[in-house]
Amino acid sequence: MKKLFLWALSALLTLPAAAQDFVPEASFYGENYWTPDTLGNHRAIVSVNTPASVAEAYIPWRRRDANPEQKGIIVINVSTGKAVDNVLPVEINREYGRIRFDASGNAGDYYVYYLPYHTSGGPYPKVNYPQQPDKADPQWKATCKATPAGKAVQAKLVRFESLGSFNSFYPMEIIATAQEKQALIDANSNKPFLLLPEDRKYPIR
């Protein structure tokens, strides 16, 4: 238990530079098409520059859904099209996710689906978001947890993709971080309220 606590604490205190540098600009958001059932409508593309048994992706997704830590993550090796079984979410919250996965097969791009769902289909479908499946090999998981935050190979964020434009979160459903909200409040502490106008081409859904 003590080792697990120290590993989690290390992960919390060692954020990559991208954590502070990421700005949610349009260039990071795109559209594509895939079969959504079991994968969901949203994914991040990350790139690993060298094969590694433990790769770590920092994904600043800025999600508005509640309890993202209760929803699963699916990682797909783009070059093979196969799912990666060895996946371990390190830290999941609405602002970002830190995910470790096995990239020993090859370097290159990986899809990270972060809102996978199952639907019953039909005119009144029931949709559920399954929790993280425990498919990781126990030995890999132990190695993964023993790897210090600074020693895992960092996967670089390429961009986010949605299933077509209708499902895109950008820009109106990309949340502000707690730090950004507090900075806005502090900069306008002498004002009774703030009015933030937006172009009508960006409706609130």
Where are these regions (language model features)?
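Positively charged n-region of N-terminal signal peptides that target proteins for export
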Residues: 1-4
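Bacterial N-terminal signal peptides
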Residues: 7-16
